[in-house]
UniProtKB/Swiss-Prot annotation:
Specifically catalyzes the dephosphorylation of 2-phosphoglycolate. Is involved in the dissimilation of the intracellular 2-phosphoglycolate formed during the DNA repair of 3'-phosphoglycolate ends, a major class of DNA lesions induced by oxidative stress. This is Phosphoglycolate phosphatase, chromosomal. GO terms for cellular component: cytosol. Mg(2+) binds at residues 14, 16, 175.
């Protein structure tokens, strides 16, 4: 794997599917929303496959799959989902194995750490607090922190700006095609975890610069030089 001499100083990390297995919380909230509309629950894997592009997209896909569009107003459904998700957020999911050890190792080695997620701040903040992961992170860029969300590169640039580092000195860790697209647009390397919500083809099909079995494996990949993004 190619490397360059500029050291990586910032590690930007996705939340859902990368740090936390939040699918149980999200699927439960989505199916509670469907129940409110008198619709049967969708399979777990179906709803989990919609995670990663923000709540409005997830709710839209759920409504379409359940055959509720255009009868149900999207805004009403999003509000209903948020109400249920506030109750399930951080209650059913769990931190992936190796995440805390990996974050601690990165912090100990001097890397600046930020979470960059499409999850709204009102949901991301309590989830990071409930899981204890907020103690490792200097910065949170949520889905509504700025006008753009991943796969737009601007959230990655914004995170680096808040960390006071050049974007070129960052590396993104995620689990989906959204993360790969954002990193490519920002011109930085991207590592994908082998678990998470990559979709039917799995993470190997998404063209990341490296695949991680665990976040604990990341420090070794960043030492002594940063990963170079694929051409």
């Amino acid at each position: 794997m190619a490397t360059v001499s500029m050291p990586c100083t910032a590690v930007l990390i996705d939340l859902d599917g990368t740090l936390v297995d939040s699918a149980p919380d999200i699927v439960e909230a989505a199916n509670r929303m469907l129940a409110d509309f008198g619709s049967p629950a969708l399979p777990f894997d179906t709803v989990a496959g919609f995670i990663g592009r923000g709540v409005p997209n997830l709710v839209r896909r759920v409504l379409e799959t359940a055959g509720l569009t255009p009868r149900v107003e999207a805004a009403e459904a999003v509000a209903m989902f948020h109400r249920h998700y506030a109750e399930t957020n951080g209650r059913l999911g769990s931190v992936f194995p190796g995440v805390e050890a990996g974050l601690e190792a990165l912090r100990r080695q001097g890397y600046r750490l930020a979470c960059v997620t499409n999850k709204p701040r009102a949901l991301a903040v309590p989830l990071l607090a409930l899981t204890g992961l907020s103690q490792y992170l200097e910065v949170l860029v949520a889905g509504d922190s700025i006008a753009q969300m991943k796969p737009d590169p601007e959230p990655l640039r914004h995170a680096c700006n808040l960390l006071d580092v050049d974007t070129a000195q960052g590396v993104l860790v995620g689990d989906s095609a959204v993360d790969v697209a954002a990193a490519r647009a920002a011109g930085i390397p991207v590592c994908l975890v082998r678990y998470g919500y990559a979709g039917p083809g799995g993470p190997a099909a998404l063209g990341a610069d490296a695949l991680l079995d665990s976040l604990e494996a990341l420090p070794a990949l960043l030492t002594p030089a940063r990963l170079a993004p694929a051409a």
